[in-house]
Amino acid sequence: MAKFAAIVLLILVASATVNAVKEHDELPTTGMSRKILLQPVFKSLIISIAEGQQCVKKDELCIPYYLDCCEPLECKKVNWWDHKCIG
């Protein structure tokens, strides 16, 4: 059941991301494609689902409120587009 919910969540996040990328092909300040910036997050999410993890390990990418860190780690912003599990 948890894997099914995670896959559905992945599909919802991916579709929202595709819509955001269609609306804004480039970031306003750097010109970098959003697709390039989001690839590591989706890779981390897919690996977590495949391994059956319920949480993300230390120093791995996370998504606040969607892909949480293992206790006692916290999902913190490390730069303007990435969040990592720090603790």
UniProtKB/Swiss-Prot annotation:
InterPro entries: Gurmarin/antifun_pep. Disulfide bonds join 55-70, 62-75, 69-85. SUPFAM superfamilies: Gurmarin-like (SSF57048). Residues 1-20 form the signal peptide. Changing residue 65 to A: May affect protein secretion, folding or stability. The modification Pyrrolidone carboxylic acid is found at residue 53. This is Pro-gurmarin. It comes from Gymnema sylvestre (Gurmar).
